[in-house]
Amino acid sequence: MVGEETSLRNRLSRSAENPEQDEAQKNLLDTHRNGHITMKQLIAKKRQLAAEAEELKPLFLKEVGCHFDDFVTNLIDKSASLDNGGCALTTFSILEEMKNNHRAKDLRAPPEQGKIFISRRSLLDELFEVDHIRTIYHMFIALLIIFILSTLVVDYIDEGRLVLEFSLLAYAFGQFPIVIWTWWAMFLSTLAIPYFLFQRWAHGYSKSSHPLIYSLIHGAFFLVFQLGILGFIPTYVVLAYTLPPASRFILILEQIRLVMKAHSYVRENVPRVLSAAKEKSSTVPVPTVNQYLYFLFAPTLIYRDSYPRTPTVRWGYVAMQFLQVFGCLFYVYYIFERLCAPLFRNIKQEPFSARVLVLCVFNSILPGVLMLFLSFFAFLHCWLNAFAEMLRFGDRMFYKDWWNSTSYSNYYRTWNVVVHDWLYYYVYKDLLWFFSKRFRPAAMLAVFALSAVVHEYALAVCLSYFYPVLFVLFMFFGMAFNFIVNDSRKRPVWNIMVRASLFLGHGVILCFYSQEWYARQRCPLKNPTFLDYVRPRTWTCRYVF
């Protein structure tokens, strides 16, 4: 965008900077004053001006369009924050509230001011149209080529031959058939059970003589499904079959995603049924199976009956996104092979000390930062855009410009918009609505606590040990920085501080968890107790790892 604005200004001021054109214009004016201008010259001049206008037209329209998109986004954000004189907004949009003005104020007041979906592209798709930004993308590709070449050269020198084995990838994604059938069981149960429970409750609520007890019974069944079936079975499979780390991550992340999806489906539709029952409506607003099925695959955690849709599917774009996901996967593999594995395998035999820890942290910053960028690009951009394109899902704002954040609060809002929306509307705003706006700090604390616990749960199950480094960083340092480095910080120096602290934090995470992984591999216990799973092995292991 910056490059296009500069180009536009340069072209607009080209006539002022070019002395030859100024002289030509002066001669033309002199000729016109003397009455000797010819019709050919006049026509040529008009054609030249028309050509220049046509040349500037696409850039001008594109710039105006970008500013208009920003204006519309800001307008929607502001309109969603209005109290509207005490009247609740609907789940879908302001226009639907005007059309179907039947929501009761006491059902879902503040939380109903929910997310409004509009058709928009992902930010990186727009930025990659600027050559200066796309060059950064090319730099990462060049770095991947260097990693591949260095690995091949080192293997050839050490082994005397080219070693084209991906043992680390094969190990990480092992026992994949178990992952497939477990995922199918999770998906089909999420498709059938919440929909059946909600449909049964919705059709019987208005007919029940004890609607509160009727609702509590169905709510209890739904809670049993969320915690007992969807919450327990995938975790049991992961531990019982001792799946490798990457296979575990697939199941655990899908488990969390489906739990959040099912909650959103019920959370958005229950108030509609309550409102219809209060108005004694003859129709029960129950979504169709197709609407729920589409939502389960859509790249959003906020349920709507319909979303903005694109007119066509660009299958070439889909293939490119999946290709980039696999490229990022191999990128991470080579980072582990070239930067991480040698670092932790070659730690000397010495007691755990501050010196060892500090050296490990600072040596882990570079691979940690690279994996941060790659995970963001692979999942939040490529993976979500691929599914959005296949489903013709119009709203592609899965993230914002988090790299420009000058505060931690802004970073948390822009890094992962998909998860942030769910936490904001279903945890933060629901708590404020249920209790009081005076409990705003408590609601914010609850959001941080839930996010920290879920992140630590995923890591503990996937790595087979409990080492609450991420929980401490997120719950204590992250929350403290959220208040200290807040939205009032606008100067560029704060962006540098946010970036530096985030990079250091990722170095700490990679160092601690990798050290603990290798320590447990090199110092196994014959009969481990429960305390052995939660006590860090790094502090006691004295073997060379």
Swiss-Prot record:
One of its GO terms (cellular component) is endoplasmic reticulum membrane. It is a multi-pass membrane protein. Residues 156-175, 240-247, 348-364, 464-469, 524-545 are lumenal. Its EC number is 2.3.1.26. Residues 9-18 have a biased composition (Polar residues). It catalyses: a sterol + a long-chain fatty acyl-CoA = a long-chain 3-hydroxysterol ester + CoA; cholesterol + an acyl-CoA = a cholesterol ester + CoA; cholesterol + (9Z)-octadecenoyl-CoA = cholesteryl (9Z-octadecenoate) + CoA; cholesterol + hexadecanoyl-CoA = cholesteryl hexadecanoate + CoA. It is found in: Endoplasmic reticulum membrane. It is an enzyme of class 2 (transferase). Keywords: Acetylation, Acyltransferase, Cholesterol metabolism, Disulfide bond, Endoplasmic reticulum, Lipid metabolism, Membrane, Phosphoprotein, Steroid metabolism, Sterol metabolism, Transferase, Transmembrane, Transmembrane helix. An acyl-CoA binds at residues 410, 413, 416, 420, 428, 451. The chain crosses the membrane at residues 134-155, 176-201, 214-239, 248-271, 315-347, 365-390, 439-463, 470-485, 492-523. Belongs to the membrane-bound acyltransferase family. Sterol o-acyltransferase subfamily. May form homo- or heterodimers. Interacts with UBIAD1. Catalyzes the formation of fatty acid-cholesterol esters, which are less soluble in membranes than cholesterol. Plays a role in lipoprotein assembly and dietary cholesterol absorption. Preferentially utilizes oleoyl-CoA ((9Z)-octadecenoyl-CoA) as substrate: shows a higher activity towards an acyl-CoA substrate with a double bond at the delta-9 position (9Z) than towards saturated acyl-CoA or an unsaturated acyl-CoA with a double bond at the delta-7 (7Z) or delta-11 (11Z) positions. This is Sterol O-acyltransferase 1. It comes from Rattus norvegicus (Rat).
